Amino acid sequence: MLIQSDYHIHASYYRVKAEGAEAGPTAVQQQAAARAAGCRYVGLLEHCNASPKHPFSCLVALAEEFYSDDFDRENTFLGVEADLNDDGSDACGAEGRAKLRLHYVIGSVHLSPAIIPTLDEYIRVEFNRIRNALIHNRNVDCIGHPFGEGIRYEKAGIIPRWGYDLIPSEYLQEILKLAKEHQVALEINRCDLQNEAYRRFWEAVRDNHLLFEIGSDAHRTANCTAVIERTQWADALGLQEEYHWKPRK
C-alpha cells in the first residue's frame, strides 16, 4: 500500500499579486492542510519562471519561512517547480538550488493555446523539453505533470477531447526509457486519470519499475485533498511504494 505524500504544494502567499487579490497560503498553512489531508510526507514549493508574478525573491522568502526557527520541518521538504527550457535546462538551475537549500526540483512545462495555438506543436514542444531535461539536466528530480497542459486545448475549444491517445506513442516510449535510464521520477497529476491511454502509460511505469511522484498541485489549502484520489488511483493500479520517489535531506 502506498504511503500518501504530496511534493507539489504551492505556498502561493509569496507570489506577486494584484492589489486586493487573495493572499494565498503560507508554507505553514499548506503544511497543516496537507497533514490534515493525510499526508505523511509534505513538499512545499513555488514556481520559478519568467513570469513577473514569480520573481526569485518569492522563493527566497519561502525558504526563509521554511528554515525559520519555529517552522516544523519533520517529514517536510522544500522544493521548486522550475519551468523547463527548450534545451532541457530549468529556470532555477543548480546555483539557485544551492542558494535556496532546496531538497528537490520539479521540472515542468507550462504552455497554453495563447502561447502555442496548435495542439500538435504544443505536444512536440513539451516532448522536446522533457526529453532534453531527462538527457542533459541532472538538477531535475521529477518531471511535473507531463503533458498536463493538453487539457487547455479542450477547454479552449481547439479540440473536442484531450487524452494521452493524442500523444505519439514514440514520444511516450522515449520518456519512459529516459526516465528509467536517468532515475528521474514522473508525476501523477492533473486531469488524465480517466483516460485509458494515460492508464496504459502508468501501467508501463509500474511494469518497468520507474520512479513516480504524486502531487496535488495545490495553490490553496482546500486543494491539498486532491492527492487522496490520485494516491488511491495509483494504489489500485498496483504502483509499489518501493518506487515511490522521496526527496533526500
Give the positions of each predicted feature.
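Domain-core and long-helix interface of multi-subunit machines
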Residues: 14-17, 100-211
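Alpha-helical scaffold elements within enzyme catalytic domains, especially in hydrolases
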Residues: 33-36, 132, 178, 204, ...
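A cross-family glycoside hydrolase active-site/sugar-binding cleft signature
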Residues: 6-10, 44-45, 77-81, 106-110, ...
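Hydrophobic alpha-helical segments and helix pairs
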Residues: 72-120
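Active-site-adjacent beta->alpha loops and helix N-cap segments on the catalytic face
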Residues: 53-63, 115-120, 195-199, 224-225
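Mid-to-C-terminal alpha-helical segments outside catalytic/metal-binding sites
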Residues: 225-249
